[in-house]
Amino acid sequence: MRLSRFFLPILKENPKEAEIVSHRLMLRAGMLRQEAAGIYAWLPLGFKVLKKIEQIVREEQNRAGALELLMPTLQLADLWRESGRYDAYGPEMLRISDRHKRELLYGPTNEEMITDIFRAYVKSYRNLPLNLYHIQWKFRDEQRPRFGVMRGREFLMKDAYSFDLDEAGARRAYNKMFVAYLRTFARMGLKGIPMRAETGPIGGDLSHEFIVLAETGESGVYCDRDVLDLPIPPASVDYDGDLTPIIKQWTSLYAATEDVHDGARFEAEVPEERRLHTRGIEVGQIFYFGTKYSEPMKALVAGPDGAEVTIHGGSYGVGVSRLAGAIIEACHDDAGIKWPEEVAPFRAVILNLKQGGSDTDAACEQLYRDLLAKGVDVLYDDTEQRAGGKFATADLIGIPWQIMVGPKSLAEGKVEVKTRSDGARQMMSPADVVARLGGGTVAG
């Protein structure tokens, strides 16, 4: 993509309404535009990041055996009355009526609808276990939306729902999502720490929040520092095997949100030098809720002996749009964003330091074509902006690889390459740049 043809409305000044780093940088970098309190338009740069986050979530859900579907944003109020949650949910739920006076709601979550789908089609234990998920926009009418996408009213979520014949099966499903979440956040450059948490309006008796440590987080958390060094399960993990050792490894060390924190246990189990009390951002939460929805909604299947059995369920959420903000909170400096490669809007940016110069123009064009041919998602800054402005833009939007093409280095057959993550610079030939980013062999 040529920057001269890309829509990137960068702000020179810090927005006054932005209270935290991620909100400020997302607005400044032209990722978002606020349309109303807690409601944002995702502009091209931000939308590219959002789609890359979504794809990682999708790949890890599929790897764990979940099946994707898509449910509507609007739901019938009667479904929620069946579960007893319509009146209990509170003013955060947006309730509306259509022209026929039918009561609807803009779904803040989907336990009722997915249970309705399940009971309509699944009648036998032979169709279990089953895990269905979707990635869809949600709405919760927050009383005080703030912090940009971290606490908005409209947001993109991945919701998965598991159905099993008994509690043992449901806990196996829970463990699969536990492991999938560890891998999902790690691929985004984050350490999502599973912490015991309250179940809230979802209900049930077992839940973990996945927390990214950040001083700007809304959640107070307590944990053993050693949890930060635990290994992430590899891509080769066998989801059909016994995941209990992984779960025990991650849950044997103390980690809890402030809502369920046990001070006496914390002090008894964790040596003082390993006690960590800080704040964090919730990026996902998983629940085992047994028969909370299947019982009132009569989601039954025929068991092995032919008798009807009430299924056991769980739900598993990831804040897809919130993750964009969480990644920035964890990956930034004073100059701007430092995107991990897997979620960066572009993997590399070519900076033409003498726009209009025949040699630099030709070298940039060739490098641009060669990188595209290798499948590299590259941005070419072909604008008339001065070099200093191009450096500032590249740092602000956080592209992992900055390739600087100037007359002096080009005279030696080289370009300068800077990695945004650590600021390291090196001189490389254009061919070596293409080989490095395109997966080939670097000369020498």
UniProtKB/Swiss-Prot annotation:
HAMAP family associated with the record: Pro_tRNA_synth_type2
A GO molecular-function annotation: proline-tRNA ligase activity
EC class name: ligase
Source domain of life: Bacteria
Function: Catalyzes the attachment of proline to tRNA(Pro) in a two-step reaction: proline is first activated by ATP to form Pro-AMP and then transferred to the acceptor end of tRNA(Pro).
Family stated for the protein in its record: Belongs to the class-II aminoacyl-tRNA synthetase family. ProS type 2 subfamily.
Keywords per UniProt: Aminoacyl-tRNA synthetase, ATP-binding, Cytoplasm, Ligase, Nucleotide-binding, Protein biosynthesis
Name under which the protein is recorded: Proline--tRNA ligase
Record GO biological process: prolyl-tRNA aminoacylation
Native source species: Bradyrhizobium sp. (strain BTAi1 / ATCC BAA-1182)
Compartment list: Cytoplasm
Matches recorded under SUPFAM superfamilies: Class II aaRS ABD-related (SSF52954), Class II aaRS and biotin synthetases (SSF55681)
InterPro entries registered for this protein in UniProt: aa-tRNA-synt_IIb, aa-tRNA-synth_II, aa-tRNA-synth_II/BPL/LPL, Anticodon-bd, Anticodon-bd_dom_sf, Pro-tRNA-ligase_IIa, Pro-tRNA-synth_IIa_bac-type, Pro-tRNA_synthetase
Keyword set includes Oxidoreductase: no
Gene Ontology CC terms, in alphabetical order: cytosol
